[in-house]
A protein has these predicted regions:
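Charged catalytic carboxylate motif
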Residues: 26, 67, 169, 205, ...
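Non-catalytic positions within long, well-ordered alpha-helices that form the structural scaffold/packing
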Residues: 76, 178, 259-262
Length: 295
């Protein structure tokens, strides 16, 4: 069973998607349509902008989404998912690629999500940190006992958990987790506390947009971040997409569930190979690859 996985924020690089634009007429048309929908030339920033420009949430999220969904489209018959999942933002890419969301609706939602998240970040200074070398329970326990808002945000792979919270909370958590034996507690260069209760304002804003968007049944089950289970029912998919903004990305469990349900290979669709590395940390033996255009 072929599993397809779609990356989230952090996978971006200048030059991403340029080969697609140059090699495929279909890709060119979709990129130009995206420039129109967004109201700015995102292709200029993706292909030849600065890291600084590309790193803004409102650019990064649509950029990664576009790279993933346009690549899946251009692959045509070579893209036949039997199960799919996306990390955070990647969940939207997975849904478009699996036919549950139209390209236009997906892009509108991703742009709305990015803007809502950027606004929520400006309300209260907040951040995230990667905690390496501790078990999930220890990290959960330390976060739970702090008075500031700090929560597990991304369960990336065994021994790698990203936490999210107020700046004071993250500082306190990093100190306590280092004392508890973490190999590293690394503050991340992100705009804010994604996947935490601090994103509540963004969740409310996005809920309105998602409720009014048509979601169809996908061609294959989508394993969603919020509980790592497979879904095909459009109403449940919507509910989970809304919950995702303030809840954790359960990536370790997602990979485990896909393996239990018969995944024999994982293909990453989009920029970078971060997710392949995370899959290997769950199961060293399973084959992983990046989706590429035929030569």
């Amino acid at each position: 069973v072929k599993a397809y996985i779609f990356p989230g924020q952090g996978a971006q690089f200048v030059g991403m998607g340029k080969d697609l634009y140059e090699r495929s007429e279909e890709a060119r048309q979709l990129f130009e349509k995206a420039n129109e929908i967004l109201g700015f030339r995102i292709t200029d920033i993706m292909f030849s902008g600065t890291d600084e420009d590309l790193k803004q949430t409102k650019v990064t999220q649509p950029a990664i989404f576009l790279h993933s969904v346009i690549l899946a489209k251009v692959l045509g018959d070579d893209f036949k998912p039997e199960m799919a999942a996306g990390h955070s933002l990647g969940e939207f890419s997975a849904l478009v690629s699996a036919g549950a969301l139209s390209f236009e609706d997906g892009l509108h939602l991703v742009a709305a999500r990015a803007n809502a998240m950027q606004k929520a970040c400006e309300i209260q200074p907040s951040t995230m940190a990667a905690i390496l070398g501790l078990d999930d329970f220890t990290v959960e326990d330390v976060c739970h006992k702090l008075t500031d808002v700090v929560v597990p945000a991304n369960y990336n792979c065994p021994g790698q958990l990203v936490i999210s919270g107020t700046i004071a909370g993250i500082d306190a958590a990093c100190e306590k987790l280092t004392a508890a034996g973490a190999k590293r507690a690394l503050k991340l260069n992100v705009g804010g506390a994604f996947h935490s209760p601090l994103m509540e304002a963004a969740r409310v804003e996005l809920e309105h947009a998602i409720v009014h968007t048509e979601i169809k049944e996908p061609v294959c089950p989508i394993y969603q971040n919020i509980d790592a289970k497979p879904y095909t029912d459009p109403e449940k998919i919507k509910h989970n997409l809304i919950a995702q903004l303030t809840g954790p990305v359960r990536w370790t469990q997602t990979v485990q569930h896909m393996l239990e349900d018969g995944a024999t290979s994982f293909t990453e669709v989009g920029p970078g190979n971060v997710l392949q590395g995370l899959v290997k940390k769950v199961d060293r033996a399973v084959p992983t690859s990046s989706a590429t255009l035929p030569e």
